[in-house]
Amino acid sequence: MKIVFAILFLTFIALTYARSFEDLKEEIKNEIEKEIFDDLEEESDELDNNVKKFNDAKPWRRWFRWKNIAPLIPVVIAASGKK
């Protein structure tokens, strides 16, 4: 009789542990998903900030390029006119 109670007790513990283990697995899965989504949001915010910086830099870069190219325009026109 003691063996039967021991087996039933161990079965009860195993079932309880199995449910707890499944709950634990689900909780870990939810935490990992939450961390992944948080990281994705942070990366998205960083990308948005980089886009803003890039767009802010565009007028400066255009002016800088024009400043380098503008003195060469008369040379190009003169060279093409001689041909």
Curated annotation (Swiss-Prot):
Modified sites of kind Serine amide: 80
Tissues expressed in: Expressed in entodermal epithelium along the body column.
The keyword Protein transport belongs to this UniProt entry's keyword annotation: no
Cellular-component GO terms for this entry: extracellular region
Location of this chain's protein in the cell: Secreted; Target cell membrane
Top-level division of the source organism's lineage: Eukaryota
Protein name: Arminin 3b
